[in-house]
């Protein structure tokens, strides 16, 4: 017997109330700087120690991407698992290896790795000190769509595990279904053939008009085929800053070296200053003007910037046009002549 829901409230009233409650809830989740000392690492069933900077599982919910830190002890091999989302890793300290679909990638400090969706992967450490790395994933985005799935296979060898989900190949024809099959097959093949490992020394760091030097760690420009996740190393010369700009969230900046502060405000001249140091995570989680400063007059500082602009922001820009979603204060940009006068520290990993 079928039933019919009875309500005397209009859909307009229901949605208006729900939307008001939703935005108020998320305003209460907003963050600025997550301190390293506030992130507690705990042993996990995978054999790692893990802490959450940003994400549902650390009681700091997000919409697009998360930020976690992991440690793998000497002689340890984690369990093998896979998930419906992708992730990027940044290696903070020590050395180790990550196996992706049966291929081992040895890494050391400041290397980066992309973990494609549905790829079996695990981590290990053959060294004599713990390896430490950050992970940033698109899981929150998949969660909003009801498509977050994870599968842990324990210590089963890769050769015994099922492959990534199968897909139908393209077929001839110009009808909508044939065209969809070909389009999706082509995209899937491309996504499954991207770069996995980026050794830090492989890319050159270059000066930009924003007043800093940068290099890609993960990005489609260097061959990664991610969900839009990108990762860039930003080097600040002593006492220098980056140009003032704004864009929608979410974007994280992990403090790799040094100390400084960030301005964040709803207008270029009205906001607050937030101090940070090595190991902290700077959070830009909504549409704010922001600018980052190296407060050390003698030494460089380094931030690693992470966001999903290639997918989330580009979609938002398309849907919101002609509203401008990425702006820079042009009077804070640096000329090429000014850039040439900056004395940049060498671009070397720790210990080199």
Per-region residue spans from a language model:
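A short beta-strand-loop-beta hairpin characteristic of the jelly-roll/cupin
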Residues: 77-109, 119, 246, 250-278, ...
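Conserved metal-binding segment of the jelly-roll/cupin
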Residues: 73-75, 100, 107-127, 133-139, ...
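Conserved short histidine dyad/triad with adjacent acidic residue
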Residues: 49-56, 66-82, 232-248, 286-287
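Eukaryotic modular interaction domains in large regulatory/scaffold proteins
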Residues: 212-213, 217-220, 229-233, 251-253, ...
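A short, N-terminal "cap"/entry segment at the start of jelly-roll beta-barrel domains
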Residues: 1-63, 151-228, 331-352
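C-terminal functional regions that serve as terminal interaction/effector modules
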Residues: 6-13, 250-256, 262-267, 272-352
């Amino acid at each position: 017997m079928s039933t019919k829901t009875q309500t005397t409230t209009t859909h307009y009233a229901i949605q208006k109330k729900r939307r008001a409650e939703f935005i108020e809830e998320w305003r209460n989740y907003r963050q600025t700087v997550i301190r390293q000392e506030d992130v507690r690492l705990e042993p996990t069933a995978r054999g790692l120690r893990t802490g959450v900077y940003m994400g549902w599982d650390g009681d700091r919910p997000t919409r697009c991407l998360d930020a976690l830190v992991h440690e793998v002890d000497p002689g340890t091999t984690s369990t093998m698992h896979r998930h419906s989302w992708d992730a990027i890793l940044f290696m903070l300290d020590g050395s180790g290896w990550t196996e992706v679909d049966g291929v081992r990638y040895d890494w050391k400090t400041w290397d980066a790795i992309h973990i494609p969706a549905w790829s079996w992967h695990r981590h290990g450490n053959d060294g004599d000190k713990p390896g430490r790395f950050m992970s940033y994933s698109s899981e929150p985005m998949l969660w909003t769509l009801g498509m977050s799935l994870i599968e842990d296979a324990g210590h089963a060898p890769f050769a015994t595990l099922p492959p990534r989900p199968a897909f139908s190949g393209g077929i001839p024809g110009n009808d909508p279904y044939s065209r969809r099959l070909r389009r999706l097959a082509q995209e899937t093949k491309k996504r499954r053939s991207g770069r996995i490992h980026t050794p830090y020394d492989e890319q050159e760091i270059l000066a930009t008009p924003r007043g800093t030097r940068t290099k890609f760690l993960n990005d489609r420009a260097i061959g990664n085929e991610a969900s839009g996740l990108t990762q860039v190393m930003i080097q600040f010369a002593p006492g220098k800053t980056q140009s003032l700009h704004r864009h929608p969230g979410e974007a994280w900046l992990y403090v790799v070296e040094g100390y400084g502060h960030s301005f964040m405000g709803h207008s270029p001249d009205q906001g607050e200053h937030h101090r940070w140091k090595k190991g902290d995570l700077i959070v830009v989680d909504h549409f704010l003007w922001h600018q980052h400063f190296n407060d050390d007059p003698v030494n460089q500082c380094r931030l690693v910037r992470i966001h999903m602009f290639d997918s989330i922001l580009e979609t938002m820009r398309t849907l919101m046009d002609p509203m401008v979603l990425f702006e820079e204060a042009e009077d804070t940009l640096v000329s090429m002549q000014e850039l040439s006068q900056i004395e940049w520290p060498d671009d070397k990993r720790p210990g080199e």
